[in-house]
Amino acid sequence: MPAVDKLIIMVPQLPPKEYSPNARVHWAARKRAGDNYGNEVYAEAVNARNLVNWQALEYASVKVEVVFAEERIRDEDNHRARFKPGMDALVRAGIIQFDDMQHISTRI
């Protein structure tokens, strides 16, 4: 089976609001929320990875699509920060090798 270079991972949970730069929460609550979301992303990523012949990408473009129930204008910077535990989970799951700015371009 040939290796694929595109993977769609759907997570039925919003990134944690505790990771927003505007959030004022206790560090333990932030950690708990990040761990929960990261574990959800990790599980979905591993499931998607195991269905195909996936090799971790050194350079990647990550597109994050967040769907909300109500239509309001949202700040992209906040959502980029909120996705931090999800990006870390993609590295842990072996989807991407690195999550720094030299190896990843991200669009939220």
For the regions a language model picked out, list residue spans one by one:
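Catalytic phosphate/metal-binding cores of nucleic-acid and nucleotide-processing enzymes, i.e., regions
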Residues: M1-I108
